[in-house]
């Protein structure tokens, strides 16, 4: 897989360069909320390699390693730290969830509230980005069990890395453990394709869609981003607003109509599915045959943490999965080789 090795070499060069070009001084407080920080940085102008486009990846000869939230079984969900580690470990695509804040900024965050990651209560859409970025996004992460919020204090080794209560790992700073904006994540990894799920729906969806399109266009990333949502209405609204040149995956209603009722699938590049919907097995041979006939790739996300291991990833690839949205990118990289 020489092309993949070339992309890997370019990516690692940029990660190392970015790590060496930034320095930071910050205050500390023993809590799960950080104080304001003062950042001093030296910028080196470097011509980044363009990321492979979604079309390039659909033609790949190997199963794609798609790091779910940066690899949330191995690293704190949706942190800059996790995404950097995923790149080093061989991810082909960074997967992330986005939501809109009270002040109209798109942030990378899965849940409607911050409770599950930060140890603080609050609703993302009711908080400003400044308020969100004070929180410790690694508060509840544990390498022994994620998501588990009833373990002993010592089972959360990065708790306080954002606030100064715990020292961040070597080479990282407190900022790497905060809730990040989509723009900053996409800017930090210009060489990485992105799989972006819009979590907001209803009244919040339009704001999230507008912000996402604005950020994608500002970064000239239309051909290296694929957009997904569980809501078929959100995907339809996104496609109408963005036009046809940003790749998408169908929402649940459209998927059900396609698979069960034989309804035509819209203009999508990829279907993203779990191995099971409840008790219903999705990845049966007829599903892969239907996808092949429709000309779409199949990316699989895990429906249970027990599936997050090398053997299961290998089994999914053997079934016919084109990409694995996984929480352990290092394990998936061994499958891809």
Question: How would you describe each model-predicted region?
Answer:
Residues 4-13:
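Sec-dependent signal peptide recognition
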